[in-house]
């Protein structure tokens, strides 16, 4: 948890209760309309604190999801659990799935540590610390019946609906490619659900990674070699069914597949 966040004992009790309600809703596949008003996070910092409590209960950190609604907006981020990662083509057990949401994304694998420091990392330093770039599918589940209708901070606290991560093969020459020139397609069971999708960050995906390395270091403890950073949806949330096969395809970056068994 972020050492810079100071919460009272009463606040911690309230947020622990919120985290437990979200965890129970995910475990039982019995979604909530929202948290009770008395338990909802009141600030973004409180929402992130709930995320950290949920991560502690669910398992080991494998990386971070980070995104922004516009090229100028301050990014939002959430931890991704290593135990929910899968390989392209793998089958996801559906007894733990309710939404079966999928999003096409582009992700980076860190090759070097970027520990916290007072001097901000430059863009070049961050790029040099990245080992590889990959197409990816983020898997989405939620403790909330409709995350878009619930309180915004509750939705953020609920790991921003993250439920898994599926990277594809590494892309050669990615450092010389303009992400703004790329687009994405999502197929489910052979039918194109979205085509021509663009990233909300305006193509500058590396801005998000640089921000994560610098502005979020008090909470993340720095970025570490072996962690994955996925940088937001190109297709929006697409819902699949039990038995579905979802394929995210990028013209330049290739494709990645996930199956719901």
Residue ranges: model-predicted function:
Residues 237, 241-242, 248-249:
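Conserved, short, structured surface segments that act as functional micro-motifs
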């Amino acid at each position: 948890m972020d050492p810079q966040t100071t919460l009272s004992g009463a606040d911690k009790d309230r947020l622990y209760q919120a985290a437990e309600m979200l965890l129970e809703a995910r475990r039982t596949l019995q979604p909530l309309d929202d948290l009770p008003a008395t338990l909802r996070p009141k600030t973004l910092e409180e929402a992130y604190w709930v995320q950290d409590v949920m991560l502690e209960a669910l398992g080991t950190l494998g990386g971070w999801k980070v995104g922004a609604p516009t090229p100028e907006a301050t990014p939002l981020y959430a931890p991704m659990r290593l135990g929910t990662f899968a390989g392209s083509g793998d089958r996801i057990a559906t007894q733990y799935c309710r939404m079966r949401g999928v999003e096409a994304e582009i992700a980076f694998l860190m090759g070097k540590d970027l520990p916290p420091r007072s001097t901000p990392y430059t863009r070049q330093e961050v790029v040099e610390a990245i080992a590889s770039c990959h197409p990816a599918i983020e898997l989405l589940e939620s403790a909330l019946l409709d995350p878009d209708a619930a309180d915004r901070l509750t939705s953020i606290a609920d790991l921003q609906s993250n439920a898994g991560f599926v990277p594809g093969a590494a892309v050669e020459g990615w450092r010389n490619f303009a992400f703004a020139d790329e687009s994405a397609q999502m197929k489910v069971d052979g039918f194109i659900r979205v085509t021509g999708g663009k990233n909300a960050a305006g193509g500058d995906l590396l801005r998000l990674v640089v921000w994560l390395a610098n502005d979020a270091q008090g909470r993340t403890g720095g970025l570490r070699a072996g962690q994955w950073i996925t940088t937001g949806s190109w297709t929006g949330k697409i819902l699949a069914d039990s038995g579905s096969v979802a394929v995210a395809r990028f013209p330049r970056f290739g494709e990645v597949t996930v199956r719901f068994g």
